[in-house]
Curated annotation (Swiss-Prot):
Disulfide links within the chain: 44-47, 44-505, 497-504
The name this protein goes by in its record: Syncytin-A
Subunit structure: The mature protein consists of a trimer of SU-TM heterodimers. The SU-TM heterodimers are attached by a labile interchain disulfide bond.
Source organism of this protein record: Mus musculus (Mouse)
Extracellular face residues: 18-544
Residue numbers covered by motif CX6CC: 497-505
Stretches the record annotates as Fusion peptide: 420-440
Stored InterPro entries: TLV/ENV_coat_polyprotein
Position of the signal peptide: 1-17
Miscellaneous comment in the UniProt entry for this protein: The mouse genome contains a high percentage of proviral-like elements, also called endogenous retroviruses (ERVs) that are the genomic traces of ancient infections of the germline by exogenous retroviruses. Although most of these elements are defective, some have conserved a functional envelope (env) gene, most probably diverted by the host for its benefit.
Tissue expression from the record: Highly expressed in placenta where it localizes to syncytiotrophoblasts of the labyrinthine zona. Specifically localizes to syncytiotrophoblast layer I (SynT-I). Also detected at very low levels in hippocampus, brain, testis and ovary.
Impact after mutating residue 493 to K: No effect on fusogenic activity. Confers immunosuppressive activity not found in the wild type protein
Gene name of the record: Syna
Pfam families reported for this sequence: TLV_coat
Length: 617
C-alpha cells in the first residue's frame, strides 16, 4: 500500500523556528528525538500523513483532568416551545409571549412552563441546572453555552500509544437511549471511574433551594408548588471512600444544580487514588475525587477553583437529558385533592465541550471535542497528533515535496507515467528519420503529414482545455455559493462539514496553470504548423541553413534562374516577337497590294453622257 504524504522535510542539527502552521509539529518531533538521543534527531526525513482520519494519541497527564476547562451547551424544549433550542436564544423566543406571573391557579400547564422560563430568565439564573456564581465573564456573561460546539468524531483511526492513567466509563441500562462513542480496552486504562446516570427523581421545595431562592423572593411570585427534577448521576471508583471536607470558600462557585445544597449536607463522598503518569512510573501521584461535584484534586497542586468551574470529569458526568415537572394538586368537585400529579414543564439537554486547544476525548478509536448528551462508552483525555514517520536521510522519497499522491495509484504506475505529448513528438521524429537516406523524401512527406496532424491535434486539445476550464470556473462559482448558503443554514451545528461529519473539501483554483499549459500547446501547434507549411523544410534544407538565409532563398533562386536562362529566353522572345510582327504585317498589307495591282492594269475611259439603255444592263 502506497502511503500518501502531505510533505516530507529534512531535519538538520540546527533547525530554526518556523512560522508556518505545520512547523510546530516538526519542531516538536525534533525536540522529542533529541530528548530520546535518537540518531534521527540530526538528519532524517519527517513525513506527515494527509489522512485526517488516521492519527496517534498520547495519554494526557493527570493535571490535565483538573486544569482543562469545559464549555456547557444547553438545549431546551417545552410543549409550547417545541425544540430543542439553544438556551441562549430563550429570551428572544420568550418575547413572543405576554409576561406571566406563576401561581397555583394556572390551569394550562403550558402557561406555567412559559411563566417558569420567564421568571428564571429575568432572575438571571440561566442555565437553570448549571452553576450559580457571581463571576461574570465578559465574553459570555453567565452563560457557558454561547460557543458553537463541534459535534462528531474528529478522527476514527486513532491509536493510543501507551496506557492512560485515568479513564471514565458510562453505560445505560437501556442502550436505545444512549449514543455509543467508543470503548477503550481495560489494558489501556490504569484506573477507570464508573459513571451511572440515574433514573430516579427528586422533588425539591423551591423555598429551601439555593438555586431558586431569587425566584421565590421576587415580588408577586406566588409559586408554591414543588418541582421534580431528574436525579443526579453517580460515580463509583471501586476504592475505599471517606467523607469529603466541607468547602465553604468555593462553595458558590461549584457547578450548582437543583439537587445540590451548598454547603453539601450530608458531606460528599471522596476517594483517594494513587496513579502513575504515562511517562513517569517511579513517582506516583495521589488524587482525591469528590463524587458530589465530580471534582478531581491532585495532592501538592493548587486548587484550580474558582477559575475553572467545569472539569472534564464533571462534563462527562453531567452530560445528559434532564426534565422538570411541577407538582399539580387537582381539586375535585367534592373538595377533595388528588396528590402526586406532575405535569411536565421543561426538558433540558446538557452537552460539554473541551475549551482547551490540543486536548481531546479518546473513546475507542475516535477522538471528540464534545461529548454527546447521552454518551456511553469508555473514554480518556489525550493529546492527538498526525501520523508521523521517520526515514533515513539517505533514503530516496518517491514523491515530490508538498505533493499529494493518491494511495490507490500503484508505485509502478507512477514511475512509468511519462509526459504524453513530448513522447509522441519524439516517436514521430524517430520514425521519420529511421528510413535512412534512401527513403528520405518519402519519410519527410509522411512526417510533414504527421506533424500537421499533430499540430491540429494540439490546437484542438488546447481549445478543449480552455473550454473545460471555463466550465470548471463557472461550476466552482456555483458550488462555492451553495457552500456558503449551506454553512449559513447549518451554522448552529458547526457548518456543513461538521453537520455531515465528513472531511471538508475545498476548491483549489488551478486555472492559471491550465491556461499557461494551453498557451504552450498553442505555441507548439503554431511552430509545427509553420514548419509543416514551409517548402524549404519540404526540400530538406532547413536544418542546414541559418534562419536569415532561409528567408532569402526564394528571391535568390528566382534571380539565378533568370540569369541562367536569359539567352534562351531572349532568343525565344526575339523570335516570337519577329514572328508575331511578320504575321501582323502580312495580314495587314495583303489586301492593299492587290488593289494597287488592280488599279495599274485598268485604263481610264470617259464616262457616257447619256443614260444607259435597259438591255445594255
Amino acid at each position: 500500500m502506497v502511503r500518501p504524504w502531505v510533505f516530507c522535510l529534512l531535519l538538520f542539527p540546527c533547525s530554526s523556528a518556523y512560522s508556518d502552521s505545520w512547523m510546530p509539529l516538526v519542531n516538536l518531533t525534533q525536540h522529542l528525538l533529541q530528548e530520546a538521543n535518537s540518531s534521527f534527531s540530526s538528519n532524517c526525513w519527517v513525513c506527515l500523513s494527509i489522512q485526517t482520519q488516521r492519527s496517534l494519541a498520547m495519554p494526557a497527564p493527570l493535571r490535565t483532568w483538573t486544569e482543562t476547562p469545559m464549555k456547557l451547551r444547553i438545549m431546551y424544549s417545552a410543549r409550547t416551545l417545541s425544540g430543542p433550542y439553544p438556551i441562549t436564544d430563550l429570551e428572544r423566543r420568550l418575547q413572543n409571549f405576554q409576561p406571566l406571573t406563576p401561581h397555583s391557579s394556572f390551569v394550562n400547564p403550558d402557561q406555567r412552563a412559559i411563566a417558569f422560563l420567564q421568571i428564571t430568565s429575568v432572575t438571571g439564573i440561566l442555565p437553570i441546572l448549571s452553576r450559580i456564581t457571581s463571576v461574570r465573564y465578559p465574553d459570555d456573561h453567565v452563560y457557558e453555552s454561547a460557543q458553537r460546539p463541534i459535534w462528531g468524531s474528529l478522527s476514527t483511526q486513532t491509536i493510543l500509544t501507551s496506557q492512560a492513567p485515568l479513564c471514565i466509563s458510562r453505560f445505560f441500562k437501556n442502550s436505545n437511549h444512549a449514543t455509543f462513542v467508543g470503548k477503550l480496552p481495560a489494558s489501556l486504562c490504569n484506573h477507570t471511574f464508573q459513571l451511572s446516570p440515574s433514573a430516579n427523581h427528586q422533588s425539591i421545595d423551591l423555598s429551601s433551594s439555593y438555586a431558586f431562592a431569587p425566584l421565590m423572593a421576587m415580588p408577586g411570585s406566588k409559586w408554591r408548588n414543588p418541582l421534580r427534577f431528574s436525579g443526579p448521576p453517580s460515580l463509583n471508583s471501586g476504592m475505599p471512600h471517606y467523607s469529603c471536607p466541607i468547602d465553604d470558600i468555593h462553595c458558590h462557585t461549584y457547578p450548582t444544580t437543583p439537587w445540590r445544597s451548598c454547603p453539601s449536607f450530608p458531606a460528599s463522598t471522596c476517594y483517594n487514588l494513587t496513579l502513575f503518569e504515562p511517562d513517569n512510573s517511579s513517582h506516583p501521584i495521589t488524587l482525591s475525587v469528590d463524587t458530589t461535584y465530580f471534582k478531581i484534586k491532585l495532592q501538592g497542586h493548587k486548587d484550580p477553583y474558582p477559575l475553572f468551574q467545569y472539569q472534564p470529569l464533571m462534563g462527562a458526568a453531567l452530560s445528559g437529558q434532564y426534565s422538570i415537572w411541577e407538582y399539580e394538586p387537582t381539586v375535585k368537585k367534592n373538595g377533595g385533592i388528588t396528590p402526586n400529579i406532575f405535569s411536565h414543564l421543561v426538558s433540558l439537554t446538557y452537552s460539554f465541550c473541551l475549551n482547551s486547544s490540543g486536548v481531546f476525548f479518546l473513546c475507542g478509536n475516535s477522538t471528540y471535542v464534545c461529548l454527546p448528551a447521552n454518551w456511553s462508552g469508555v473514554c480518556t483525555l489525550v493529546f492527538q497528533y498526525p501520523d508521523i514517520e521517520l526515514l533515513p536521510n539517505n533514503q530516496t522519497i518517491s514523491v515530490p515535496l508538498f505533493a499529494t499522491v493518491p494511495s490507490s495509484v500503484p508505485a509502478s504506475r507512477r514511475k512509468r507515467a511519462l509526459p504524453l505529448l513530448p513522447l509522441l513528438a519524439g516517436l514521430g521524429i524517430a520514425s521519420a528519420l529511421g528510413l535512412g537516406i534512401a527513403g528520405i523524401t518519402t519519410s519527410t512527406v509522411y512526417f510533414q503529414q504527421l506533424s500537421k496532424a499533430l499540430s491540429d491535434s494540439l490546437d484542438e486539445i488546447a481549445t478543449s482545455i480552455i473550454s473545460l476550464q471555463d466550465q470548471i470556473d463557472s461550476l466552482a462559482g456555483v458550488v462555492l455559493q451553495n457552500r456558503r448558503a449551506l454553512d449559513l443554514i447549518v451554522a448552529e451545528r458547526g457548518g456543513t462539514c461538521l453537520f455531515l461529519q465528513e472531511e471538508c473539501c475545498f476548491y483549489i483554483n488551478q486555472s492559471g496553470v491550465v491556461r499557461h499549459a494551453a498557451r504552450k500547446l498553442r505555441e507548439r501547434a503554431s511552430e509545427l504548423g509553420t514548419s509543416s507549411s514551409s517548402w524549404i523544410q519540404w526540400l530538406g534544407l532547413g536544418p542546414w541553413l541559418p534562419s536569415w538565409l532561409t528567408s532569402l532563398m526564394a528571391p535568390i533562386l528566382f534571380i539565378l534562374v533568370l540569369l541562367v536562362f536569359r539567352p534562351c529566353l531572349l532568343n525565344c522572345l526575339t523570335h516570337s516577337v519577329s514572328r508575331r510582327m511578320s504575321s501582323f504585317i502580312h495580314t495587314t498589307t495583303e489586301g492593299h497590294v492587290d488593289k494597287i495591282l488592280l488599279l495599274r492594269e485598268s485604263q481610264y475611259k470617259r464616262l457616257p453622257q447619256e443614260p444607259p439603255e435597259e438591255d445594255a444592263v
